[in-house]
């Protein structure tokens, strides 16, 4: 490949990478605004999108279909209380969750979680990771 053509290709590749980086930053800003205080979920989304954003940028049909917007938004989030009696006879109340992320290829994966240490961000992260 002639040197001038090679430089042109390298410049174009850098431009594509920068454009994807800008779009990734903008997309992540929107995800964070819709899902504040869910840092585990933000991290999972960033890791996946940093890999797929260049492909999405080169295939506008996926942008038009809003594929990224669809995969980061759960279809359903169920939040419920779980009252129970501990070994001392004391009533305890925990919050339970079920995140149903995407049913495009069949039933939802995952289960119910109601441990006191979990929160919505952790469970959205787990559900998001299971759709790939």
Segments and roles (model prediction):
Residues 4-9, 18-132:
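N-terminal ligand-binding/catalytic initiation module
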């Amino acid at each position: 490949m002639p040197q001038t053509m090679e430089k042109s290709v390298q410049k174009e590749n850098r431009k594509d990478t920068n454009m994807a980086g800008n779009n990734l930053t903008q997309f992540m800003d929107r995800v964070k605004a819709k899902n504040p205080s869910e840092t585990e979920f933000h991290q999972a989304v960033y890791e996946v999108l940093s890999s797929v954003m260049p492909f999405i940028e080169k295939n506008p049909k996926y942008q038009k279909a809003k594929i990224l917007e669809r995969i980061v938004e759960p279809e359903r989030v169920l939040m419920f209380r779980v009252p129970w009696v501990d070994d001392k006879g004391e009533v305890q109340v925990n919050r339970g969750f079920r995140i149903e992320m995407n049913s495009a290829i069949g039933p939802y994966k995952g289960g119910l979680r109601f441990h006191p240490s979990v929160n919505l961000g952790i469970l959205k992260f787990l559900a998001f990771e299971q759709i790939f």
